[in-house]
Amino acid sequence: MRLVKIGLASVNTTVGATHANVERALRFAREMAAADVTVAAYPEQMIGGYPPEDLIQWQGFVEDQWRALEHFARETREQPTVHVLGVAVLHEGLRYGCAAVVAGGEIRGLVPKEKLPTYSIYYEGRTFSRGFPYQRGEHRGVPFGDVIFRFDFGVVAPEVCEDAWTTECPMRRRTYSGAELVVNISGSAFRVGTDQTRREMLITRAGDHQCTLAYVNLVGGNDGLLFDGGGFVFQNGKLMLDAARWREGWEATTVDLDRTMRLRSENTTWRMDHTAWAASHDPVPTIEIPATEFRTRREKLTYPVPAHGSFLLPAPEKYVPARTRYCEDVLDALAMGVGDYFEKNRVFKTVGVALSGGRDSLLTLLVAHRWAARKKPDAPGSLLRAFYMPSRYSSAETEKAARTVCDELGIPLRVVSIDAAFERELEAVRAMLQPGEPLTQLTEQNIQARIRGQRMWSWSNSSGGLFLQTGNMSERAVGYTTVGGDLEGALAVIANVPKTVVMVLLDYLQETHPLEGIRLALQKPPGPELAPNQVGEEELMPFRVLDACFHLFADEKLLPEEVERVVLTMFPDLTPDVVHGYVTKFVKMFLTSIYKWVQAPLSLHIGNLDLDRERALQLPVVTHAEWALKKK
């Protein structure tokens, strides 16, 4: 047996906090070394934080990462552990994201990332250069390039995140060159369903390349990107460790690398592919780390025994319904996003939400409370502030819902009418209009929203509070929001959450954590209450139809007539004329609302589609719907 203990450390980093990030990692390094971990893996860009965006263009930022890496090496000198961690370097005038290998107080090598994602929410090709096969060099006297490492326990191949997300991956040539343990350090942002995609992809890679594959992910929120942490260890396609997500910390498992090599020798397909590859390729160079120079501590390791007491029977699994997994993932992601934005900015004293008594602001408050309950379990409400600012159009039902949920959660609520300010603003606007120019009903509605937005900013300035914006993705997509009003805030919590998902999340929360305030909010049809008897679906369309149009047009990029055909199939009770009207209305509103998206605050990203300009969907502000709505 060749037993190796693999530790996966999900570290919650802050971009730019190089030495603070290293100190967080060192705490885990000491704990893992004390637990006889042989190889410890940390996330991509762990030292500088991820994503650094254009901050990486500052040479001083990159240089400081090297100093922090040297500090990490010095502090781990006496540890019998190989550490693999992420760092950015400036090598021969180019910037690379690398996996650094540290052992025995020395930086043993740097392996640059080869696959640079420049799609969806990622822009690495903008600032980073890619490594390439058989690249060799030295960086400050340290081996740099496409290399693998031989230690006293076996051969390790470090790689970075996207390098595993393609069949043409460096893992192939490195395992054919003798690597037994592949360590993938990652900064893979959360999107709904991504965890399952990662699992399936990585277990396939470990099986295809007949290796032990250790994968660790970054955890925490940085700007609008949310990282769910966790990690896996797969041995030749068999799951050995599934580390917990949504928390900072480390987990470890022991594997027998002799088993990896035995399975290779028994797999004729792998052997023949290896022989064919070796006939036309040179092996990847191996950096030898002699045992006289560095030795791991593996004497006390024990063979991995199934916790359920059988090598033959499957381990019992706790069944979790798909809806529960979905809702918990989204809620955990959003709560972490609020908390890390609050804490990492280091300027806020409290969190504020303007409640309307409706669904969106209620969900935003519940998400903030979810974070606060973990941050301060004894008094989560002390971190939060809520405000209800009624006008003549606000209903008694929404005020009751707002008061009730705040009472139940222990959140201080202030009720401050906007009626007097509304009257003053109406008079001021009338005075600005030309004779005969009417003050429109839409203007009256927007004035109310803008008074509330202005007051929330004033509260934020005076209290040092984080002002959370409460709008959902569906209504932002079609511009059903007021610039300077309900579009205001420092952080948009649910701006990447479609309206139908908002409703599902509230239903789920009411089932799992029943509150009278949620029940009251769900009783009333959703609407902004800026005019008498205002109902959102009557002014727009049924939200299920709107979200279908949004997905098909914005995400799938279908033409309007194609959207109509799909919507008719989804909703057979609707007539073709009605569907045509809905789709036409959606496309017009969508393409004429882009100017609002670019003025919206930063939003938390949970899906593959995002309206933040620098994320997944980048559209010109000045555009026309002519191409989409030509008469056939």
Q: What are the language-model segments listed below?
A:
Residues 5, 16, 21, 152, ...:
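ATP/NTP-dependent adenylation/nucleotidyl-transfer catalytic domains that generate, transfer
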Residues 1-354, 370-379, 408, 413:
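Enzyme catalytic cores with a strong preference for nitrogen-chemistry domains
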